[in-house]
C-alpha cells in the first residue's frame, strides 16, 4: 500500500512540473529547455533557505519566485534579444548550473539532514510520511489547476492563449506579444521550480544535476494525457496532465522491475518511451484516416 501511495505521490509531484512544461509547449508553442535548470534551482533555493532557518513554507515560496525570475530571464532573452526559443533555454540552463552551485554554497549537492520540511510538518499532524506527501501533492495539483483555470478565463489568460495560437492576429489586435510570452515563461518556470523544491524536501537533499531529463518527463506526461483523454476544457486538460504524469511514473517503475536491467540503459528506455509517446498522436491520425477510407470503399 505504501509503495502504491508513494508512486501516486511522485506522479502527482511530477504533474506540477508537467503543467509548467504544458504552458510553454502547448499554450505558447515553445520548446523551453529552461525547465532543466529551473527544477534544480527550486531545489537549491529551498534547501539552502531551510538550512538558513527559514520556515519551509516560506522557503518553498522563495523557490517558486526564483523559478519565475529564471523564466523572466529566458523570456527577455527570447523576446528582447531575439534569441531562438530553443537556444534561449540552453543559454539560461547553462547559466543556472553555476548559479545553483553558488546557491548551495559551492557544492554540487546539499543535504537537509534533520531540518523541518513541509512534509514533516504535515506528518506531525498524525499522518504517515507517505500520506503527508500524497496529501500535499494532491492539494498543490488541485490548487495549481484551479488558479490557472481561473487565470485562463481572464483577459490576460485569453490573450496569453491567443498569443500561442496566432501571433500575427494577436499583434493586429494590439496585444503586446513579447509581454505575454514573458508572463508565460515566468509562470511555467515558477511551477517547475516549485516542483523541484517539493522533490528536494521529499528526497532530503538538492542536487545540481536533478533537472536532467525534466523536459522528457514533462513532455511525456502532457502527450500521454492528450492521447488518453480528448476534447477537454482548459481545467480538465490541466487535471488530465496529473493522470498522464502518474501513468508515466508507473511505466518507468515497471521498466525498473525488468530482471537484470543495466541501470545505464534506463535513460535509453526513457528516450524510446518519449519517442513512442510523441508518435502516438500521429499514429492515431493515420488510423483514423485509414478507417475513414475503408468506410468509403
Positions of PLM-derived features:
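Single transmembrane alpha-helix segments in multi-pass membrane proteins
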Residues: 3-55, 60, 76-81, 223-230, ...
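Loop-to-transmembrane alpha-helix initiation sites
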Residues: 10, 86, 113, 133-138, ...
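Alpha-helical transmembrane segments within multi-pass membrane transporters and channels
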Residues: 21, 54-94, 99, 244, ...
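Membrane-interface helix caps of multi-pass small-molecule transporters
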Residues: 23, 48, 72, 76-81, ...
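Helix-loop-helix "hairpin" substructures at the membrane interface of multi-pass membrane proteins
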Residues: 70, 130-215
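Transmembrane helix-bundle core of multi-pass membrane transporters
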Residues: 85, 89, 96-153, 183, ...
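Cytosolic-side transmembrane-helix boundaries in multi-pass membrane proteins
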Residues: 165-172, 176-179, 239, 251-297
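Transmembrane alpha-helical segments in multi-pass inner-membrane proteins
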Residues: 192, 196, 202-267
Amino acid at each position: 500500500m505504501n509503495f502504491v501511495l508513494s508512486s501516486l505521490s511522485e506522479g502527482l509531484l511530477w504533474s506540477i512540473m508537467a503543467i509548467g512544461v504544458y504552458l510553454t509547449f502547448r499554450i505558447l508553442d515553445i520548446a523551453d529547455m529552461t525547465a532543466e535548470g529551473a527544477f534544480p534551482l527550486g531545489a537549491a533555493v529551498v534547501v539552502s533557505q531551510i538550512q538558513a532557518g527559514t520556515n519551509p513554507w516560506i522557503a518553498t515560496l522563495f523557490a517558486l519566485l526564483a523559478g519565475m525570475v529564471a523564466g523572466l530571464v529566458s523570456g527577455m532573452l527570447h523576446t528582447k534579444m531575439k534569441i531562438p526559443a530553443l537556444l534561449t533555454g540552453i543559454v539560461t540552463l547553462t547559466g543556472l548550473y553555476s548559479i545553483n552551485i553558488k546557491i548551495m554554497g559551492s557544492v554540487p549537492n546539499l543535504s537537509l539532514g534533520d531540518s523541518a520540511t513541509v512534509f514533516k510538518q504535515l506528518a506531525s499532524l498524525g499522518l504517515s510520511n507517505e500520506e503527508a506527501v500524497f496529501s500535499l501533492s494532491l492539494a498543490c495539483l488541485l490548487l495549481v489547476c484551479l488558479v490557472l483555470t481561473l487565470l485562463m478565463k481572464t483577459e490576460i489568460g485569453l490573450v496569453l492563449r491567443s498569443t500561442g495560437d496566432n501571433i500575427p492576429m494577436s499583434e493586429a489586435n494590439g496585444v503586446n506579444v513579447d509581454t505575454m510570452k514573458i508572463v508565460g515563461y515566468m509562470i511555467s518556470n515558477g511551477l517547475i521550480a516549485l516542483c523541484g523544491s517539493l522533490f528536494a524536501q521529499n528526497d532530503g537533499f538538492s542536487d545540481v544535476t536533478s533537472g536532467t531529463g525534466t523536459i522528457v518527463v514533462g513532455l511525456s506526461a502532457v502527450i500521454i494525457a492528450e492521447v488518453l483523454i480528448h476534447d477537454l476544457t482548459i481545467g480538465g486538460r490541466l487535471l488530465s496532465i496529473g493522470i498522464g504524469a502518474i501513468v508515466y511514473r508507473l511505466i518507468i517503475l515497471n521498466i525498473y522491475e525488468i530482471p537484470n536491467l543495466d541501470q545505464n540503459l534506463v535513460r535509453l528506455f526513457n528516450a524510446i518511451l518519449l519517442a513512442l509517446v510523441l508518435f502516438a498522436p500521429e499514429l492515431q491520425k493515420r488510423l483514423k484516416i485509414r478507417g475513414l477510407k475503408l468506410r468509403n470503399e
